[in-house]
């Protein structure tokens, strides 16, 4: 760990130094620190099928057709569906919605469900966060006489399914400008569709006697879906999240306010709250509860219903954590025989399909390799499994999954660079793991070689203050593609180190300036770093590295270090 030679004082312009060190040109600093929609928003018409989708929806609205929104069961799907439902309501249309059951129906549009919706009177179905690869299901829908518009962001194949329109910046035939927005979450694409739809209706004089909807009020949904889906926070996504957090802080959306209360968030939310507090609660509904809870919460106008759903989601999230811990332990036990594999493929019966994505993410973090966790069901040797994968930066897992499907190693599969889902026959597990190992070995090796810890600042302990956190927050929002700053603090002496909770390392450190601070490393009890600090010589000095957070549990807020690494300083 290179801690650098210069120790910064808070009198320095830390914010400017941080942005410049990350490659932001001086003339772009203000734009980066305060991203606006005006600066980053593209013309939605640049996206293929966008105008066709807007015109078809406008026609359905004007003629009074029955519209149904078909969403995925995760946060991106729930926020995308809620965005369109809210928009349609503001336009005077009561649209229905359908969220599939994760365990019974799996990911993506079900042909049977689409046909059933058609039989119930829907003449237009808009799928969000799913559908780009659903050839069979969308063929069934077409044969049933229902139009389907797909709004998605997942990887596409060259041959597209039959639709009335397919809006996806990751279409292989997309324009360069639209393709440059391939990092958008589905909710971001849905927001662009909302702009296009309002523009189309405006041209048809739809708003002569009706107020235009306030599209900016939808940005709280866009921010939540973007962060929770781990979309890269650069360009338009930065503007979405930055502006969306301002909307969220107003607590205008009843369901969001209830979710903030259930999460015990009293202050204005920041981007990490979306990913670690709000998002997991909504996801818990789709993972182990009712798939519709997220959409119901985000669209309700009843404060009591919102409070009840938010509390239910919080309880489900606690249950999810317990289930996840069991699967995590079992999955880690399988790692012993996979040290030489470039991709960790772990599978077993009895694992809850609702938590395998989270466990895959944990395994990825532990091994610094892409990980796929598969829940098998059925008879031995003849079972199928549903799998979820998470990748490391620089390794396109979604493309590899699509390639495996095209090689007939998978029943179904798709995704994007950082995450993927699949269905596989148990008999093909070994061949699938070998295929991924061969295809991705070089990419994984290159990506891991470039993952040396990057430090943004070097500080004396006295510089670790709440004011520093406030200063660094000004360069946010932080997330994938724009990580929270990592600082090195030292040299320090470890005053105390112990294990708290089940497996968290807690450290009290003191610097040569006489200032002390607290550091904590989550789920790190068995790591080499923890063992070194627990059994240190009291005379040794260390540099500690991690991210600075506010600890507001005590009577006075204090800065603490979320510890990621340590190195001897002497």
Regions found by a protein language model. Name each.
Residues 2-123, 144-145, 162, 199-428, ...:
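Hydrophobic helix-and-loop "lid/oligomerization" segment in the mid-to-C-terminal part
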Residues 59-65, 305-346, 381-383, 395, ...:
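Mid-to-C-terminal polyanion-binding domains and interfaces
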Residues 150, 166-168, 223, 373, ...:
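Structural signal for conserved beta-strand scaffold positions within catalytic alpha/beta enzyme cores
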Residues 153-154, 169, 352, 416, ...:
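Histidine-centered active-site/metal-ligand motif
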Residues 138-139, 155, 178-181, 266-267, ...:
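A generic local secondary-structure boundary/capping motif
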Residues 19, 126, 283, 472, ...:
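A residue-level signal for conserved active-site and pocket-lining positions in enzyme catalytic cores
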Residues 110-113, 134-138, 151-153, 357-360, ...:
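Short beta-alpha junctions and helix-cap segments that line functional grooves
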Residues 115-208:
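Active-site cavity-forming subdomains of large catalytic enzyme subunits
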């Amino acid at each position: 760990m290179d801690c650098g030679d210069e120790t910064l004082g808070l009198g320095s312009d830390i914010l400017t130094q941080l942005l410049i060190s990350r490659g932001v040109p001086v003339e772009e600093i203000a734009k980066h620190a305060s991203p606006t929609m005006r600066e980053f928003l593209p013309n939605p018409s640049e996206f293929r099928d966008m105008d066709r989708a807007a015109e078809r929806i406008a026609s359905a609205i004007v003629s009074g057709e029955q519209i149904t929104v078909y969403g995925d069961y995760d946060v991106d799907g729930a926020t995308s569906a809620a965005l369109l439902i809210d928009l349609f309501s503001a336009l005077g249309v009561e649209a229905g919605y359908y969220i599939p059951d994760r365990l019974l129906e799996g990911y993506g549009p079900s042909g049977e469900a689409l046909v059933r919706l058609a039989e119930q009177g829907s003449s237009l179905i808009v799928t969000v966060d799913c559908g780009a690869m659903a050839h069979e299901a969308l063929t069934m829908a077409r044969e049933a006489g229902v139009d389907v518009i797909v709004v998605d962001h997942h990887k596409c194949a060259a041959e597209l399914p039959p639709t009335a329109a397919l809006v996806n910046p990751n279409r292989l035939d997309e324009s360069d400008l639209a393709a440059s927005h391939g990092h958008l979450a589905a909710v971001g694409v849905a927001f662009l569709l909302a702009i296009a739809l309002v523009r189309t209706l405006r041209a048809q004089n739809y708003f002569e006697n009706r107020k235009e909807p306030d599209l900016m009020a939808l940005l709280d949904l866009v921010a939540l879906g973007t962060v929770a889906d781990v979309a890269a926070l650069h360009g338009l996504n930065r503007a979405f999240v930055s502006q969306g957090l301002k909307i969220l802080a107003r607590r205008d959306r009843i369901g969001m306010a209830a979710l903030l209360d259930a999460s015990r968030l009293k202050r204005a939310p920041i981007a990490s709250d979306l990913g670690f507090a709000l998002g997991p609660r909504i996801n818990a509904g789709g993972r182990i509860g009712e798939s519709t809870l997220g959409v119901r919460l985000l669209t309700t106008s009843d404060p009591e219903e919102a409070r009840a759903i938010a509390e239910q989601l919080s309880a489900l999230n606690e249950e999810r954590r317990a289930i996840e811990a069991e699967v995590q332990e079992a999955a880690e036990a399988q790692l012993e025989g996979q040290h030489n594999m470039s991709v960790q493929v772990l599978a077993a019966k009895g694992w809850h399909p609702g938590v395998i994505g989270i466990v895959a993410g944990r395994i990825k973090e532990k091994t610094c390799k892409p990980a796929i966790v598969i829940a098998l069901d059925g008879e031995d040797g003849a079972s199928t499994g549903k799998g979820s994968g998470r990748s490391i930066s620089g390794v396109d897992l979604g493309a590899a999954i699509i390639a495996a499907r095209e090689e007939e190693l998978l029943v179904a599969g798709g995704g994007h660079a950082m995450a993927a889902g699949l269905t596989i026959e148990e008999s093909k597990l070994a061949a699938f793991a070998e295929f991924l190992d061969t295809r991705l070995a070089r990419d994984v090796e290159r990506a891991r070689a470039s993952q040396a810890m990057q430090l943004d600042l070097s500080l004396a302990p006295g510089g670790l203050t709440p004011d520093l956190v406030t200063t660094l927050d000004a360069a946010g929002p932080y997330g994938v593609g724009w990580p929270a700053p990592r600082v090195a603090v030292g040299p320090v002496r470890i005053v105390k180190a112990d294990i708290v909770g089940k497996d968290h390392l807690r450290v009290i450190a003191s610097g040569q300036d006489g200032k002390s601070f607290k550091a904590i490393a989550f789920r790190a009890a068995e790591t080499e770093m923890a063992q070194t600090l627990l059994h240190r010589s009291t005379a040794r000095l260390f540099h500690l590295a991690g991210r600075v957070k506010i600890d507001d549990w005590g009577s006075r807020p204090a800065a603490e270090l979320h510890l990621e690494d340590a190195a001897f300083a002497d």
